Amino acid sequence: KKSLAMASLLALGTSAMALDVQPFVGVGIERTTLDYKGSVSVPGIGYSDSYSDDDSDTALKLKAGAILDKTHRLSVSHAKYSDNGADVRILLLNYDYLFPINEKFNLYAGAHAGQAKYEQDVNTAIGKIDIDMSGLVYGLQVGALFDITKNIELEAGLAYSKYNVDDTISGTYLGVDYSLKTELEDSTSMFIGINYKF
């Protein structure tokens, strides 16, 4: 039993040492179009309305992670968008599977999940309304990686994300109750950047 346990530990240690881990950091530009919708209800006067729209913005995206055995890439990324008085911060955990085309060129496909935070001050006929909401964001991405040098890599990709982010604000104005709901739906993104592999 002791020899079996020792052999198992030795095999585990050998496997861990054999794992090729290559840390990296990256920076790039991401262009995102975010779709959202909302509704307004004033029950006291029988009024209700709904709307949908989209905002587009370009943001600096930062990421850090590691490539495991030249095949699996894990990373954390952060981006902040600002448009029409709204701030959107997105923090993601990303996984990519790499498909080598040749020694310098890889394609990848993967998934991401994390948190999105949305803040906006809206001026309305009843005064300023503060929208502050956060929740889950998740989705899929595809892209390509090209080695410029041994350590410097060019990356370009596309991503699609869904959001579980909404907020409902209720109040009373001139004795009349109202309710305002805002909800993030989905987004599409295009990214290009540079990674440094250690």
Identify the meaning behind each predicted range.
Residues 149-198:
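Predominantly the C-terminal beta-signal and adjacent terminal strand-loop region
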Residues 1-22:
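Cleavable N-terminal export/targeting peptides
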Residues 6, 78-80, 158:
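A mature extracytoplasmic/lumenal domain signature
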Residues 19-33:
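Transmembrane beta-strand segments of Gram-negative outer membrane beta-barrel proteins
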Residues 60-125, 129-138, 146-148, 188-198:
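Gram-negative (and chloroplast) outer-membrane scaffold detector with strong preference
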Residues 33-54, 74-91, 115-134, 164-185:
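Flexible, solvent-exposed loop segments that connect beta-strands
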